[in-house]
């Protein structure tokens, strides 16, 4: 069970989900990345789920796969695709009819692929996608198996027994190790919030040592839809948490920070100090957020095209009638997109996304600021 790929390895120096690659290659932001929501099913109900309100007990009928592939064919500079849910691997019918064809199309075109999964299903299910998969992305916010059993099923009315939930946890770790051995990059993402902060060192060790993940992603948690009740960190707490992570991390494992609310244009010297440390650290990257810059999300059931799968901005079109490039151009012309459209080339920064701006910088006009470092 091995992956056969001759494509360039994904490394801190080459991250196909980094929106700044468009600026490097084409001089400006482009539509190079599409995310598909392929299911509303999930066998967990995490308290931090960004799309929890959209989960259902049964999937609606999906649009034809030929239409989805046709819309991808219309994107000349497509570089990466992602598949998300729900749990995209839960329905074998969906895996065979949508997940595999999308990944296979992309792989054969040289487009890099990612799927978001909780990795709790039997390993045989993942064998369907290994030949076409570059990155398996998993959320990992558990200090202990007890945390997993509690947090991972917090929003479920009828929970499996504790023993069943603990077995899910063990299977997740086993599956991660198996996929890494098969040549897939397993990237575990941890949300920084009041719940994970006390356990952050243990979580990092579990990801790098027990699960053998090649990458640990760290994202601050922003209140979005389903997870709006969870307590976010203050900017000061977040800076302290990131410094602590940099102190204790395994330097041989790639650590990727995403949607950080700290920018080189900040007048705050503590922000500047943290950014200098991040830039100098070995195997550390800070990713520009792809949502609304290089990426659009497509719902395969209703066909809606949106900026992100957990946002509340209205649809930009529908794949039944609109091409993805036309929806992208429509987004670029919106007032919101223009407010977020800033670029400091000397630090390769594309500014904040919608969630960051709404959470911390509602009154800041980033287009009038410039990098100070």
UniProtKB/Swiss-Prot annotation:
<dbReference type="GO" id="GO:0051539">
    <property type="term" value="F:4 iron, 4 sulfur cluster binding"/>
</dbReference>
<keyword id="KW-0949">S-adenosyl-L-methionine</keyword>
<keyword id="KW-0479">Metal-binding</keyword>
<dbReference type="GO" id="GO:0003824">
    <property type="term" value="F:catalytic activity"/>
</dbReference>
<keyword id="KW-0004">4Fe-4S</keyword>
<feature type="binding site">
    <location>
        <position position="46"/>
    </location>
    <ligand>
        <name>[4Fe-4S] cluster</name>
    </ligand>
</feature>
<keyword id="KW-0411">Iron-sulfur</keyword>
<feature type="binding site">
    <location>
        <position position="49"/>
    </location>
    <ligand>
        <name>[4Fe-4S] cluster</name>
    </ligand>
</feature>
<dbReference type="InterPro" id="IPR007197">
    <property type="entry name" value="rSAM"/>
</dbReference>
<dbReference type="InterPro" id="IPR014866">
    <property type="entry name" value="YfkB"/>
</dbReference>
<feature type="binding site">
    <location>
        <position position="42"/>
    </location>
    <ligand>
        <name>[4Fe-4S] cluster</name>
    </ligand>
</feature>
<protein>
    <recommendedName>
        <fullName>Putative protein YfkA</fullName>
    </recommendedName>
</protein>
<comment type="similarity">
    <text>Belongs to the radical SAM superfamily.</text>
</comment>
<dbReference type="GO" id="GO:0046872">
    <property type="term" value="F:metal ion binding"/>
</dbReference>
<dbReference type="Pfam" id="PF08756">
    <property type="entry name" value="YfkB"/>
</dbReference>
<keyword id="KW-0408">Iron</keyword>
<feature type="domain" description="Radical SAM core">
    <location>
        <begin position="26"/>
        <end position="256"/>
    </location>
</feature>
<dbReference type="InterPro" id="IPR031004">
    <property type="entry name" value="rSAM_YfkAB"/>
</dbReference>
<dbReference type="Pfam" id="PF04055">
    <property type="entry name" value="Radical_SAM"/>
</dbReference>
<dbReference type="InterPro" id="IPR013785">
    <property type="entry name" value="Aldolase_TIM"/>
</dbReference>
